[in-house]
UniProtKB/Swiss-Prot annotation:
The modification Phosphothreonine is found at T632. SUPFAM superfamilies: alpha-catenin/vinculin-like (SSF47220). Residues 912-927 have a biased composition (Basic and acidic residues). It is found in: Cell membrane; Cytoplasm; Cytoplasm, Cytoskeleton; Cell junction, Adherens junction. Interacts with CDH1 and CDH2. Interacts with ZNF639; recruits CTNNA2 to the nucleus. Interacts with F-actin. This is Catenin alpha-2. The lineage of its organism: Eukaryota, Metazoa, Chordata, Craniata, Vertebrata. Disruption phenotype: Mice generally die within 24 hours after birth. They display altered Purkinje cells migration, unstable synaptic junctions, defective ventricular architecture, impaired axon migration, reduced number of neurons in specific nuclei, and disordered laminar formation. The gene is Ctnna2.
Length: 953
């Protein structure tokens, strides 16, 4: 315990003339101005006018004398009131009086003879001495203020120690009441000191320390009370000791900030922009070199080392558990692209060595290098946003589960959930640090790191509070202690969330949120179809959480813009999502869960749920479109989710060559791209025929609104997958390996099976036997061509690349034919298998397997794949038409009320909306939409003082 008589140690050199507060600066400024003006009188040398006394100089000298007298009076008053610095203040006052008298004499003599350089020099020396003396007096007065603050701190420390030593709850209440009174006084004095501090860092430290003191004082009472009530529970002591330590650190922080001796941000590790962002920035600067001074031996190792360091950081992010597979592949691909761009750039520098100016190829290489690093940044930002979107979703759930377990008194369960809560907290901190690593916002990064540090230290104490409650579930004191720590945790998580949101891009957030909601919508639909209630409930909750985050963040973002057309459009979109779309979605989720959870599953309208889910996705997409309305083309390009396919995604251990050799480890897509030109031409002919069939399907499905019509939805899905498969035969598209082609064929088969089920239901309701037979015949074609597509894709899978040469294994076709009916019996039943097998295409069987030309085998395999896709496309077109015709026959017999049967709903698609008036040019519109300045809260006292200051001029 600190003794009441122990001296207060001031960490401040009294001899220092460093000005640390705005008050000292403000008081000193008029005197400096007056002295400077006096010194500069007749500065330009002797005047041509009649010599005589300068009235202006005498007036200035008098004003300096009066100002000095004012300082003396104030200094004497402060010296009388001060206890700790009385001697120093008295000595400083006497020094000011002495220097003031010297200045009075020197200025008077100079005013009488302003042209005398000797008298002017004497006055300049006297002025300097006077300013030094006055500055020292003001600094000592400032020190006296700090000493008063330190005295308050000492009293608070003693009151804190008294609270810690309380022996019972009544004693604790009395001592805490005294502690609260002293806290109020300290806060007032510290707030005044904070306003006066000149250094922004010290002001921030003072504000942070005051905030920490206020925050922890709330927990101090409940933690101490819990310890006194349940001293046998070890967790209560841990809680109390933690809070006391936090309060002591806050008091020390106020002391350090008041004396401007706070540890720097560098010492705390909170300073600077993100490490990866800084490395990328530095790399972008280093690649701009002078060809005249370029030396490969000097610059190549340096640039390559810097790039590999960046790629190592990117690889860590790519390998993180929350990074999605497609994002991981894109990051790896961008890293390879950046590597290649650097080699190309260095080659161009070597070609331009010794030249005064950079040639066009070199400038192009520099631009390409910059673009590739920008693309890598974008993928890293999106990867981080993936993490943020997943980790900062429903952040209170682990805490609530932990508290519920604690209330039940199940200590074993509490320990299990405590581990989950700890992992959740660690994940928040990890993701926050990831967000910092790629951010250029220095102040924002500092806030995130500070908030993450608080989360890290608070997590164990929340668990201790839960353990206390679990040990004494009936104790109101334990419950109150838990509530206080719960509130503190939730506040700190909100602070961290807002800080992370501030250093991340709204555009990236919307792009990733849109993708994640689409993923979750698909999961919901699958869970609904499979009757998985738990997955449906959990995923629907995630959708609601993501949508709520979108609404909150966008509404907050719009507060930074001046009200206008732009903000109105964005806010309309958020309002529609929050007030119309989400309530409908929640209602449909509730209906679906009730129906699936019943003892006997109840029928419900599945299409209604799918429509409600789709509207959520559409709502988020509309918000994103509205937000991007004022973006520049460059910003839109940087935000684009479109991934260039000008590189091949390889594993990090694969061999890479400068030319287009066929090498082990290449993807099958790359192999297809390297076929001879004549083979490519033949494939192109087949693709052209396929596109003709595709255009027919596009024209057919474009007529219909796909909401409530799963036949149209499935037709679109099958068309998209078939396009990807035909792109694969040309060495393009998202399918990279033969396994991807097989999976795509399986997806088509699954979609075909679902379409078969729907269309058969339509056929069953059709009263016209001719229409019914036509529809069933087309469905047989779909089953047949799905079967063909599966076979062709699997025969294609047997094409291998060995030793740099393409060969086709001899057992591929036979094994595919013999196993197909066992693997894909869901496509066509065994009874129709023998009937359909006679119509199967010759999938590469025209060429002798293993003995003919490998290119010919590849060509046959590719053309068979395209032919099967074309046939399937045609069958889908005919099925869509026949399904509609069958529905119209049903309508004619049973009436118009039954046209939208329970199977599918046939509604004409509404035409696209067109503007009634000509749109303004984007550049003209953009000039009127500008970001508003941040709202500043000005206190009435400050406003009044500024008004008085203006009135005084």
């Amino acid at each position: 315990m600190t003794s009441a008589t122990s001296p207060i140690i001031l960490k401040w050199d009294p001899k220092s003339l460093e000005i640390r507060t705005l008050t000292v600066e403000r008081l000193l400024e008029p005197l400096v101005t007056q002295v400077t003006t006096l010194v500069n009188t007749s500065n330009k040398g002797p005047s041509g006018k009649k010599k005589g006394r300068s009235k202006k100089a005498h007036v200035l000298a008098a004003s300096v004398e009066q100002a000095t007298q004012n300082f003396l009076e104030k200094g004497e008053q402060i010296a009388k009131e001060s206890q700790d610095l009385k001697e120093e203040l008295v000595a400083a006052v006497e020094d000011v009086r002495k220097q003031g008298e010297t200045m009075r004499i020197a200025s008077s003599e100079f005013a009488d003879d302003p042209c005398s350089s000797v008298k002017r020099g004497t006055m300049v020396r006297a002025a300097r001495a006077l300013l030094s003396a006055v500055t020292r007096l003001l600094i000592l007065a400032d020190m006296a203020d700090v000493m008063r603050l330190l005295s308050h701190l000492k009293i608070v420390e003693e009151a804190l120690e008294a609270v810690k030593n309380a022996t019972n709850e009544q004693d604790l209440a009395n001592r805490f009441k005294e502690f609260g009174k002293e806290m109020v006084k300290l806060n007032y004095v510290a707030a005044r000191r904070q306003q006066e501090l000149k250094d922004p860092h010290c002001r921030d430290e003072m504000a942070a320390a005051r905030g920490a003191l206020k925050k922890n004082a709330t927990m101090l009472y409940t933690a101490s009370q819990a310890f006194l009530r349940h001293p046998d529970v070890a967790a209560t002591r841990a809680n109390r000791d933690y809070v006391f330590k936090q309060v002591q650190e806050a008091i020390a922080g106020i002391s350090s900030a008041a004396q401007a001796t706070s540890p720097t941000d560098e010492a705390k590790g909170h300073t600077g922009i993100g490490e990866l962002a800084a490395a990328l920035n530095e790399f972008d600067n280093k690649i701009i070199l002078d060809p005249m001074t370029f030396s490969e031996a000097r610059f190549r190792p340096s640039l390559e080392e810097r790039l590999e360091s960046i790629i190592s950081g990117a690889a860590l992010m790519a390998d993180s558990s929350c990074t999605r597979d497609d994002r991981r592949e894109r990051i790896v691909a961008e890293c390879n692209a950046v590597r290649q761009a650097l080699q190309d750039l260095l080659s161009e520098y070597m070609n331009n060595t010794g030249r005064k100016e950079k040639g066009d190829p070199l400038n192009i290489a520099i631009d390409k290098m910059t673009k590739k690093t920008r693309d890598l940044r974008r993928q890293l930002r999106k990867a981080v946003m993936d993490h943020i979107s997943d980790s900062f979703l429903e952040t209170n759930v682990p805490l609530l589960v932990l508290i519920e377990a604690a209330k039940s008194g199940n200590e074993k369960e509490v320990k299990e959930y405590a581990q989950v809560f700890r992992e959740h907290a660690n994940k928040l901190v990890e993701v926050a640090n990831l967000a910092c690593s790629i951010s250029n916002n220095e102040e924002g990064v500092k806030l995130v790191r500070m908030a993450a540090t608080q989360i890290d230290s608070l997590c164990p104490q929340v668990i201790n509070a839960a353990l206390t409650l679990a040990a004494r579930p009936q104790s109101k004191v334990a419950q109150d202690n838990m509530d206080v720590f719960k509130d503190q945790w939730e506040k700190q998580v909100r602070v961290l969330t807002e800080a992370v949101d501030d250093i991340t891009s709204v555009d990236d957030f919307l792009s990733v949120s849109e993708n994640h909601i689409l993923e979750d919508v698909n999961k919901c639909v699958i869970a609904l179809q499979e009757g998985d209630v738990d997955t449906l409930d959990r995923t629907a909750g995630a959708i609601r959480g993501r949508a709520a985050r979108v609404i909150h963040i966008i509404n907050a973002e719009m507060e930074n813009y001046e009200a206008g057309v732009y903000t109105e459009k964005v806010l309309e979109a958020t309002k529609l999502l929050s007030e119309t779309v989400m309530p409908r979605f929640a209602e449909q989720v509730e209906v679906a869960i009730e129906a699936l959870s019943a003892n006997v599953p109840q029928p419900f309208e599945e299409n209604e749920f799918i429509d409600a889910s789709r509207l959520v996705y559409d709502g988020v997409r509309d918000i994103r479109k509205a937000v991007l309305m004022i973006r520049t083309p460059e910003e839109l390009e940087d935000d684009s989710d479109f991934e260039q396919e000008d590189y091949d995604v390889r594993s990090r251990t694969s061999v890479q060559t400068e030319d287009d050799q066929l090498i082990a480890g290449q993807s099958a897509r790359a192999i297809m791209a390297q076929l001879p030109q004549e083979e490519k031409a033949k494939i192109a002919e087949q693709v052209e025929i396929f596109h003709q069939e595709k255009s027919k399907l596009d024209a057919e499905v474009a007529k219909w609104d796909d909401s409530g019509n799963d036949i149209i939805v499935l037709a679109k899905q099958m068309c998209m997958i078939m396009m990807e498969m035909t792109d694969f035969t040309r060495g393009k598209g998202p399918l990279k390996n033969t396994s991807d082609v097989i999976n795509a064929a399986k997806k088509i088969a699954e979609a075909g099976s679902r379409m078969d089920k729907l269309a058969r239901a339509v056929a069953d309701q059709c009263p016209d036997s001719a229409c019914k037979q036509d529809l069933l015949a087309y469905l047989q074609r779909i089953a047949l061509y799905c079967h063909q597509l599966n076979i062709c894709s699997k025969v294609k899978a047997e094409v291998q690349n060995l030793g740099g040469e393409l060969i086709v294994s001899g057992t591929g076709v036979q094994s595919t034919f013999t196993t197909f009916y066992e693997v894909d019996c869901d496509v066509i039943d065994g009874g129709r298998a023998s009937q359909l097998s006679t119509h199967l295409p010759t999938c590469a069987e025209g060429a002798p397997i293993g003995s003919g030309s490998s290119d010919s085998s590849m060509l046959d395999s590719a053309t068979s794949l395209i032919q099967a896709a074309k046939n399937l496309m045609n069958a889908v077109v005919l099925t869509v038409k026949a399904s509609y015709v069958a529905s119209t026959k049903y309508q004619k017999v049973y009436g118009t009320a039954a046209v939208n049967s329970p199977v599918v709903s046939w509604k004409m698609k509404a035409p696209e909306k067109k503007p009634l008036v000509k749109r303004e040019k984007p550049e003209e519109f953009q000039t009127r939409v500008r970001r508003g300045s941040q709202k500043k809260h000005i206190s009435p006292v400050q406003a009044l003082s500024e008004f008085k200051a203006m009135d005084s001029f």
